């Protein structure tokens, strides 16, 4: 039916199914032409409303449209725990609505939550590939739980220190005996390195999910590491070498740390080499006393430069040169006098001042009276302006 025929049928009020079937089989170009042939705004609005309410077209044959299947949600660890331990013998006589709270209490204190997370992830991976019908959950747990030494439903309450009782209302309750030895023991393989792929490989070896094909190009998304419990084991692990195969992130971090350590070592070594070079150069400039040990070289990876350093040459000159007996930079103030009241002018030469000081009357060169063991009656030197008592 062409567009003109469709417009003519609209005038005779055709059935809704016929209109929908016509609109579903139109192409985009035909729909544009159809809107151009309907000039009235009310008719265009009615056609637009009909297009919005159309059901999706179901195509047959090789042109059939198939919507992409959404990824299924992974099985929750608690749900897996509940599915396995709902068969505890003490719970069989009670409906599920009265057991939900009890199983929740068991889950809160269960020591094997990490193992349940691994098991449910492994089963979810199998289910997503081969389907739920070919991967029964109860069969999966019946294979993997005994392998991981998980407590069986028949012995779970006794192993973990739980006891079941009936309250006044006739409902089941559980109580935990924290003082019992079994309450403090984790039943799972806490000392085993385990991954999702390890679990899948084991159940497949037991004949479960034989059609499942693991992707060899991807690593396991979840890994349960080894639990170190003894001091000797901790010391052995501390001295162990780095694993040959490490994640890409760990390899990048290790390489970055090595580069930083190398830069720090080069920096420290360079400063030490420069300091040793300066010390050796100082020894070269001033060999020291005869017989004093002087190393030929210092253990340093850097080459030593034996050229004299001006700073140390000047420093050695300051300490080795005699102290001069002149004051070229000293200036006398006007009207200055010596101790014996001898006037001194700021124009007097320094050489003349040395003579004045040497020939001053107060200057005494005989100090025999002050030597050790001198006569106590010795005559002290006299001064012109001071009378001896």
From Swiss-Prot:
The keyword Transcription applies. Its main location: nucleus. It comes from the Eukaryota. One of its GO terms (molecular function) is DNA binding, bending. Pfam families: MATalpha_HMGbox. Mating type proteins are sequence specific DNA-binding proteins that act as master switches in fungal differentiation by controlling gene expression in a cell type-specific fashion. Transcriptional activator that induces the transcription of alpha-specific genes. Belongs to the MATALPHA1 family. This is Mating-type protein MAT-1. It comes from Alternaria alternata. The lineage of its organism: Eukaryota, Fungi, Dikarya, Ascomycota, Pezizomycotina. The gene is MAT1.
